[in-house]
């Protein structure tokens, strides 16, 4: 591997090595002041920390003939998580992706993240690696194949986390992004009603939902239904709403199975995200669609499909995967033109304007080697869709499927990916989370699910799993007798942990009169509650007739401390 040979490089390398190995200072991976933004700055922020060296030299990299190294010989420790950040800009191109790669001495390269860099201003490149070995690595920056590209890099930082430190940071973020401090203020007619009164708080519906996919087998098994409805309040159907399932023969629609599953969900207050209005992969079209060669004919049947399925379920879904996997594939673009996806989303928004319309892809958060669907490329595709004329008010969404390999997940890369996907400010969902069976499947799945839950951009998770009878062979949550597997125990644990337990709190005694002097005001202690809908009941053991019930929603928008006022007619 070629190295810089100009004189100042060795001094800069020494200073940056001190910075990386000594200070541990970097862009905080759990601070979202900048990580969810995509502004390009005229000057990168400068650290005020004592780093032991300048650490802010501008490294000018000509990506030509392999001259791209920035830092050599950084020692990693197996099991630790390393977050790396840098500010980058281009000097001879207007816009180009710039990526960060970690190179091991055995020749293996691990992609750490990338950013869409621009000429003349600085973009934050944030990524990292979860070490599955101990030993030295080199860090280098590169672009997407343009020889002679000139890249400037400043403020390279790396921070190491032990797993326990990472988990602690996750828990602290969860307190900020998933919970609010709440204080109840109650107005009573008389003091005797105030004294001894108790507030009972019961969560009816959490804002964040951990759901699970279902398939047609749930209609054939009472035990599967009972198992499912006792746990989950969010689902999507694996195949039953897809075009090949509802119109296997041209002109002969059959929604019987999808309708029955929809009825089951609605009867049990289970929310449904619609999965796949259209699929951009030719392989998964109905067989009769594959034979169509006339673009006008394909356009007509496509419009019929969209009108049929979206009107049928309008008002009954909480979102739609509109053009499934349209970063990996381009069947409709090849047949109908390059703007096919944008036009489809435009039509979908007119058919159902009140729900988010998702771009749903695989390998974006779970597999760093599939650069076709890198987070930057997914964001670019969504930007193309919403920037199409007339699409600026579309309610967009990003679906990251999350089919993880049976190895230690790269949580540093996953966090970078979620940061990037979240930069559009659309809701991000993990939509099909599973993992092939392996000895550490439960441990790895817990790492993945907690990583998603602790990220502010992620609004929901749907598992691709179920009991053995359901046929989900990767993430099996219960055996043939519906006894939990270890993976099932994990999911039950998280469902319980991410749901607010019922709680009772007293009304504090330091009451005072209101401004008119006609009522007595009491306050509850502050309490931390998960976001969601609650049933709040005020009772007094000494007053049998006092039992007043209220509905309260705890939301992020209410600020750090949410004041809830209740008027008690006693």
Swiss-Prot record:
GO molecular function, one term: endo-1,4-beta-xylanase activity
InterPro entries: GH10, GH10_dom, Glycoside_hydrolase_SF
Keywords, comma-separated and alphabetical: Carbohydrate metabolism, Glycoprotein, Glycosidase, Hydrolase, Polysaccharide degradation, Repeat, Signal, Xylan degradation
Name listed for the protein in its UniProt record: Endo-1,4-beta-xylanase 4
Signal peptide bounds: 1-24
Function text: Binds to and hydrolyzes insoluble and soluble xylan substrates.
EC number: 3.2.1.8
Domain notes: The GH10 domain binds to xylan.
One Pfam family linked to the record: Glyco_hydro_10
Gene name, Swiss-Prot/TrEMBL: XYN4
Domain GH10, chain residue ranges per copy: 195-494
Major enzyme class: hydrolase
PROSITE patterns recorded: GH10_2
Residues at the catalytic site: 325, 432
Catalytic reaction equation(s): Endohydrolysis of (1->4)-beta-D-xylosidic linkages in xylans
Family designation: Belongs to the glycosyl hydrolase 10 (cellulase F) family.
Superkingdom of origin: Eukaryota
């Amino acid at each position: 591997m070629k190295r810089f040979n100009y004189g100042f490089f060795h001094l800069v390398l020494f200073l940056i090595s001190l910075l990386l190995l000594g200070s541990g200072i970097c862009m905080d991976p759990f601070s979202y002041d900048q990580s969810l933004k995509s502004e390009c700055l005229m000057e990168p922020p400068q650290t005020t920390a004592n780093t032991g060296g300048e650490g802010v030299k501008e490294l000018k990299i000509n990506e030509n003939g392999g001259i791209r190294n920035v830092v050599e010989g950084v020692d990693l420790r197996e099991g630790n998580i390393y977050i790396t950040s840098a500010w980058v800009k281009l000097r001879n191109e207007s816009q180009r992706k710039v990526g960060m790669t970690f190179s091991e001495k055995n020749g293996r390269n691990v992609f750490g993240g990338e950013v869409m860099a621009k000429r003349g201003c600085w973009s934050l490149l944030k990524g990292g690696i979860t070490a599955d070995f101990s030993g030295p690595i080199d860090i280098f920056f590169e672009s997407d194949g343009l020889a002679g590209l000139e890249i400037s890099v400043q403020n390279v930082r790396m921070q190491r986390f032990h797993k326990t430190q990472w988990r602690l940071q996750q828990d602290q973020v969860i307190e900020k992004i998933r919970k609010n401090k709440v204080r109840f203020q109650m107005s009573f007619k008389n003091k005797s009603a105030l004294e001894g009164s108790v507030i009972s708080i019961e969560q009816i519906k959490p804002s964040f939902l951990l759901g699970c996919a279902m398939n047609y087998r749930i209609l054939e098994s009472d035990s599967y239904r009972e198992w499912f409805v006792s746990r989950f309040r969010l689902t999507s159907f694996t195949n039953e709403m897809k075009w090949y399932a509802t119109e296997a023969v041209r002109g002969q629609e059959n929604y019987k199975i999808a309708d029955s599953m929809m009825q089951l969900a609605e009867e049990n207050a289970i929310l449904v995200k619609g999965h796949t209005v259209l699929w951009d992969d030719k392989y998964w079209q109905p067989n009769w669609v594959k034979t169509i060669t006339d673009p006008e004919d394909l356009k007509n049947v496509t419009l019929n499909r969209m009108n049929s399925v979206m009107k049928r379920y309008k008002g009954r879904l909480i979102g739609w995967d509109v053009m499934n996997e349209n970063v990996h594939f381009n069947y409709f673009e090849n047949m109908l033109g390059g703007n096919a996806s944008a036009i489809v989303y435009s039509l979908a928004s007119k058919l159902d304007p009140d729900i988010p319309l998702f771009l749903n892809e695989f390998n974006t958060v779970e597999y760093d080697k599939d650069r076709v669907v890198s987070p930057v490329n997914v964001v670019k595709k969504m930007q193309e869709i919403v920037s199409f004329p007339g699409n600026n008010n579309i309610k967009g969404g990003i679906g990251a499927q999350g089919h993880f390999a049976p190895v230690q997940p790269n949580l540093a890369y996953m966090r970078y990916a979620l940061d990037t996907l979240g930069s559009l400010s659309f809701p991000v969902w993990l939509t099909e989370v599973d993992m092939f069976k392996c000895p550490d499947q439960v441990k790895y799945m817990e790492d993945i699910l907690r990583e998603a839950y602790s990220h502010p951009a992620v609004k929901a998770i749907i598992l691709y799993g179920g009991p053995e009878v359901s046929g989900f062979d990767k993430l099996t949550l219960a055996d043939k007798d519906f006894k939990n597997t270890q993976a099932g125990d994990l999911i039950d644990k998280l469902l319980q942990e991410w749901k607010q337990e019922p709680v009772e709190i007293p009304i504090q005694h330091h009451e005072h009169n209101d401004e008119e002097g006609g009522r007595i005001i009491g306050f509850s202690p502050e309490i931390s509650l998960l976001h969601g809908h609650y049933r709040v009941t005020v009772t007094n053991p000494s007053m049998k007739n006092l039992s007043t019930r209220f509905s309260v929603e705890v939301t992020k928008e209410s600020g750090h401390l949410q004041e809830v006022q209740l008027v008690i007619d006693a």
